[in-house]
Amino acid sequence: VVIPGSYGSLATTKYDVIFHGKSAHAGGSPEVGRNVMLAVGTAILNLYAIPRHSGGVSRVNVGTVVAGSGRNVIADEAKMEIEVRGETTEINEYMKNYAVNIIESAAKMHGCTCEMKLMGAANSLASSEALMERVKRVCEEDLHLPVAKEMSSKNGGSEDVSYMMNRVQEQGGQATF
């Protein structure tokens, strides 16, 4: 079954975040340490509290956190993997900017530092209506292929092809996926 086009792929930005603190003995001198567990915890709670955007779907997820070296040691390093998504590239940008501010502020609040490494990104996409209709017509009439009744689907995923499609459409062309 041919699906002539799609829409609904969310724009996304993915980061690896490394928090740096200062190790100390949790029982002997906890005040000497700079606990990244506090920074990470503060960041996580506030990331999930980002106000959602009225212009469309928005998402945030903390996928993994790895931290600590022992139960009696103030953690001095943590790695967190996060992603934000938005129904449009603009909504994703809103989520990204909010997330970066939260992460940097959480680190600073607890006397830690952080570095953020961009691990991936994709823009939102929407197939060109006229091209979707043409693909549908060619598949049905010329190639005699079955065509899905629903021409598009919202799957909540993201697609790298969005960069190419958006560039083609910005130049006046048509694109479908």
Located regions from the model:
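Midchain, well-structured core segments that form catalytic/ion-binding scaffolds
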Residues: 1-127, 156
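Alpha-helix C-cap/termination motif
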Residues: 53, 109, 141-142, 167, ...
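Generic hydrophobic alpha-helical scaffold/packing signal
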Residues: 83, 96, 100, 104, ...
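C-terminal helix-coil-helix/basic helical segment that borders enzyme active sites and/or dimer interfaces
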Residues: 112-116, 140-155
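Short, low-order "capping/linker" segments at domain edges
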Residues: 125-142
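Zn-dependent metallopeptidase/amidohydrolase metal-coordination segment
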Residues: 148-177
